[in-house]
Amino acid sequence: MSFSQAVSGLNAAATNLDVIGNNIANSATYGFKSGTASFADMFAGSKVGLGVKVAGITQDFTDGTTTNTGRGLDVAISQNGFFRLVDSNGSVFYSRNGQFKLDENRNLVNMQGMQLTGYPATGTPPTIQQGANPAPITIPNTLMAAKSTTTASMQINLNSTDPVPSKTPFSVSDADSYNKKGTVTVYDSQGNAHDMNVYFVKTKDNEWAVYTHDSSDPAATAPTTASTTLKFNENGILESGGTVNITTGTINGATAATFSLSFLNSMQQNTGANNIVATNQNGYKPGDLVSYQINNDGTVVGNYSNEQEQVLGQIVLANFANNEGLASQGDNVWAATQASGVALLGTAGSGNFGKLTNGALEASNVDLSKELVNMIVAQRNYQSNAQTIKTQDQILNTLVNLR
């Protein structure tokens, strides 16, 4: 009789308890994937066998629960995909833990300082360069440059029953010489705001002269001729004159803004008071970075004090042919191996890649109730193998005491 079978059983049961204990210990670790010990019998030419061995430890890569945190740099993956990280030596690792922060160089890093990689954003305005080599994502604390207005719009409802003004000619300083005044604020090359006043003067039925004046420029000359004439049909629908090109004055040495002002969707109706429905334009002043977040498509976006946002990069995800072939490196990261296959890169929601949820984290997929039951079973297994050794010892004692 040999003790080897029971000893192998003790070793296997101890390993199983270690795996279960590791699962329980990491039940609150974001992005953790539970492990399972697999066993195989040892056979050496006899029907009895030589016991048991640990064949391997596999990981369960099913999704954990998505837990909302509300933090802008937290992001959870659901379904397929891993975050791609690089360490200080340039080695590449992969993780499901989406807890990120800024380091001293304003790189997005995980809690161990590994840099999150993605596609860069370049150009003016910045655009994502998908397909480029992934690089560490940085959130620069730089000023967002001003943008000169190139297009603007004003939607107005004009009252068809308004009389032609009694005062002529038109004057910006005489409210009796026009029917309605509106303002659209536009920006020049330095981000200086220009309040462009727009005056509407009824000249006859279904026709309105439009005058424009840059009230922010002290040197601006008051207009004496109309910039355009709005002509409506008998149903009050604008037929012509709905677009005019305007150039602002010059302030502080900036280049003047030349933009197209559209009155499309404006109407003439018997509606009571003349009404400016909406104004819009595409320029803005400079802005400081105020906040930043990761969106559900993986884009990293900065929010600026000028109420604009700017894309700073986009997270890349990695897929593998065989997730179980990844080698665990601790710190909640894995390394690619020959068994896992090479990493296939892409973005969230594209192809076979999973989805991202911003302001959330993927919880551990450990089923704590199941692991506690498994621990009891493993403990009984250990005790049973110990009892086998005890029984064999008693048999040997009996043999020794034979006379």
UniProtKB/Swiss-Prot annotation:
UniProt cross-references to Gene3D superfamilies, sorted A to Z: Flagellar hook protein FlgE
Intracellular or extracellular location(s): Bacterial flagellum basal body
Repeat in keyword set: no
Keyword annotations of the record: Bacterial flagellum
One Pfam family matching this protein: LlgE_F_G_D1
GO cellular component: bacterial-type flagellum; bacterial-type flagellum basal body; bacterial-type flagellum hook; cytosol
Coiled-coil region list: none
Gene Ontology annotations of biological process type: bacterial-type flagellum-dependent swarming motility
Top-level taxon of origin: Bacteria
InterPro entries given in the database record: Falgellar_hook_FlgE_sf (IPR037058), Flag_bb_rod_N (IPR001444), Flagellar_basal_body_rod_CS (IPR019776), Flagellar_FlgE/F/G (IPR020013), Flg_bb/hook_C_dom (IPR010930), FlgE/F/G-like (IPR037925), FlgE_D2 (IPR011491), LlgE_F_G-like_D1 (IPR053967)
Family: Belongs to the flagella basal body rod proteins family.
Protein name, entry field: Flagellar hook protein FlgE
Organism: Salmonella typhimurium (strain LT2 / SGSC1412 / ATCC 700720)
Biological classification of the source: Bacteria, Pseudomonadati, Pseudomonadota, Gammaproteobacteria, Enterobacterales
